[in-house]
Amino acid sequence: MQIGLDFNLVEDLVAGVDEVGRGPLCGAVVTAAVILDPARPILGLNDSKKLTEAKREALFDEICEKALSFCIARAEVEEIDRLNILQATMLAMQRAVEGLHITPKLALIDGNRCPKLAVPASPVVKGDSQVPAIAAASILAKVTRDREMSAFELIYPGYGIGGHKGYPTPVHLEALARLGPTPIHRRSFAPVRAAWEAREGVTDSLI
């Protein structure tokens, strides 16, 4: 038994659902849904933010190998800008649950809101620190998104995306003001919108 995590919650085809990437200024919001196998326990599950990158990577592979079912889903930047980040996150969570090849009897959602699902769902505040399946989902989502951000570092150099993963750090905000938004920046987010409008103003003044 792992302290702080209730393994009894996985015994009846319960899916844990979590997201990564609501706060960043760029990139998709990534979600995952996981149904763990009680017969194949995974040691060391915890909130992905509390684990080292090496531990997350190792657990990612183990979760994919041992879970009864898992699905990693997303909502793209265009959807975030069109719907807003909350609704886009709910959509991505919905996609993750619908993508499971086994239908869960219950979906436990990290946080205080649930997406509209075809199965019963319940929110669990700080669930990624309490429910093993949610912890597993948080790891799948974070590793997936972090890998994408590292790849974007090569496509859009100068922003430091591989380091801050899109979050509004001073380095990111300075680069955004200096270089302007990229196609993966969320224009509905205030700092990106301000940088975009500033560049449009400069362009207009040159015409």
Curated annotation (Swiss-Prot):
It holds the Pfam family RNase_HII. It is an enzyme of class 3 (hydrolase). Keywords: Cytoplasm, Endonuclease, Hydrolase, Manganese, Metal-binding, Nuclease. Its cofactor is Mn(2+); Mg(2+). Its EC number is 3.1.26.4. Gene3D superfamilies: Ribonuclease H-like superfamily/Ribonuclease H (3.30.420.10). GO terms for biological process: DNA replication, removal of RNA primer; mismatch repair. Residues 12-201 form the RNase H type-2 domain. It comes from the Bacteria. Transmembrane segments: none annotated. GO terms for molecular function: manganese ion binding; RNA binding; RNA-DNA hybrid ribonuclease activity. Its main location: cytoplasm. GO terms for cellular component: cytoplasm; ribonuclease H2 complex. Manganese or magnesium. Binds 1 divalent metal ion per monomer in the absence of substrate. May bind a second metal ion after substrate binding. A divalent metal cation binds at residues 18-19, 110. It catalyses: Endonucleolytic cleavage to 5'-phosphomonoester. It is found in: Cytoplasm. Endonuclease that specifically degrades the RNA of RNA-DNA hybrids. NCBIfam families: PRK00015.1-3, PRK00015.1-4. Belongs to the RNase HII family. This is Ribonuclease HII. The gene is rnhB.
